[in-house]
Amino acid sequence: MDAIRGFVYRTIYENTQRTYCVFILKDYNEEYITCTGKFESPKEGEDIEVRGRYVEHEKYGRQFDASSVEKLKPDNMGAAKTYLLNLGIKGFGEKSVEKVLEYFGIRILEILREERPEEIKDIPGLRKSVKDELFNTLLGEGILSDLNHFFESHHISSKWSRIVYIYYGVQSVAVIEDNPYTLLRVAPDMLFGTADTLAEHLGINGSDTRRLEAGLEWILRSLDNQGHTCLPVDQLIGRLDDLLQTDVDDIANFIESLLEQGALYSTYYEDILYIYPPEMYVSEVEGVQYTRELLLQADPISLDIPSFIEKFERDNYITFGDAQKEAIQLSFFEKFSLITGGPGTGKTTIIKALVKGFQLGGLGRIILCAPTGRAAKRLTEATEFEATTIHRLLVPVQGSDSYDFTKNEDDPLDIDVIIIDEASMLNVRLFYSLMAAIPKEAHVIIVGDVDQLPPIGAGFVLKDLLDSDCVPYTRLNQIYRQSSGNTIVESAYAINRGEMPNLEGVSEEFSFIPVKSYDMMMKAIIDVYKREQETIEDELDIQIISPMRRGEAGSTLISQYVQQAVNPPDSYKGEVRVNGITYRVGDKVIQILNDYELEVFNGEIGVIYAITRTDICIRFIHKEVRLPIDEAHMIMPAYAITVHKSQGSEYGVVIIPFVPRYGGMLQRNLLYTAVTRAKRKVIIVGTTSAVERAVRTVNADERYTLFKERLQGRCDS
């Protein structure tokens, strides 16, 4: 392994997660060396030592592949001044640094080299807050250096040093040595095998409780992403055996001990033992219990329903079908009911009627909500009644996980009626959180299209509620929205029936552009986007929807190409490059993490209207926000988004890339969901074979959940 010393001349690239960087190092021989590393980029001007080896990149030539980086302690007074200034401490500028150097003289080099930050507290003339921050920063630099050496000695990338220090502080190395698997809790991108190898180096054997515990936690953490609330015990043992390659009896005994301690929960159903993480068990069991309590009550409102329906029809120049009338009557009569149907079946018109009817019936405290901001806005426009997102309604607890809300059973919502739209997006944890906050006196109406993609997260609540046959529901089948020749709706229903849509027909609403290569696809997408952009007033009314995020045909790369084509650099446009991504005034962006302080949530799309020295200013549907540039990891470019991210939204124009390289993502419900996002126009850019594959592929991924069975009373809690 080679070691090179020098200073960072320029940072070229750093990814969003700050786990990969490219920078130019100027060594002590005045040679400029391109370095790459899987760690947070060092700051420009810092003296560092990188360790690694030279490699030959097929495109960029000779580079230094660094496995670790260490900030060097200064060896002269000029370097000491630069070192202290580069610490980036607020209120600790050039004058303050001069005070430190004047007070310590040459001794500052020894203090920094031997990591004795406690002596900093003796300096006169500096504010206590600055001295405390300087002490903590220098202490942290020493610990980071120790962590870097620790990781390097075990042949592990030092990219995780900073996140470990943030969590464990001065005890970082001691914590890891005691239990290296704690790394998996604080370093989300670390593989289990990395921590496992470190544990082996530290003498932890294969059946050690710490290893079994970490393996189990690793498996259970993946359940939510896979849609499961639980796993059959045999599958859980099998997965752990595959991961740990240890004695199966040890695994079984360990699971049994956790069940006895209450650290895991279980349920028997049809002679199979299902194992739950605690939060999933509570969400499933309590979510069902809240539902049952409402189902046991029937509380019809004081309203002449037939007369109300007739008057609503006259006032709005419409005629309800039998199923629509049934849905309205059921919602007024039952405390808990469902309405499901595809596009154009009148779900939103029914919601509008329900709002009016409940108001006339004396139940005026009505809430309309949906999982996403765009869905809530659409609901507001269609019903002329203010709707909100579920997250805003429940008021998230800042600093906690995504399902911890201030509104709950102890502090319920002050409502008479709640109508939840786009309910196909409800996973079991969000459903539980919502039901816990609904008072027992309220009417609950759940509305959604059960044929869309299942939710992100565990369970498929809407489907389970319908399939249980325990919940009063209405299924809408008759199409009303522009029923005369609406090819978007016709194509969506054809896809849902497993039939090919007409890809050869000439239609303003639904069209197909065949392509034979990736380059052709990208050119067609850009050409169509530019053309359709001229027909809309709102940039948010056109959307590219891709089956997946990563890869050459993924939404991330498509967004980059479209940005260059429709919003190129210009001297009058502000722009900023953060973590390797360029953001420019006029760009569409999507929020990818909940920001409770700014009240902007995952999935919301906006447009950048200004960029300042410190902030990216974004106009979202419901508000304008100033996002600090150092928090830009919370957004991504959004010219293209995934189908999952598009759920709950509608756009005037939808462009759908659909090519064979999407592989296993070519599924019927995915294509159906993408097509039904469009109000006026759908353009599919791809191949006939990809569409054919999706139409005939029914997503058969099994989700392990006993929500339906609990509702039916067929399994014990």
Each predicted region: which residue ranges?
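Conserved helicase motor core of SF1/SF2 NTP-dependent helicases
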Residues: 333, 353, 357, 361-364, ...
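Short aromatic-glycine-enriched beta-strand elements
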Residues: 13-25, 613-617
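Conserved helicase motor core of P-loop NTPases
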Residues: 450-598
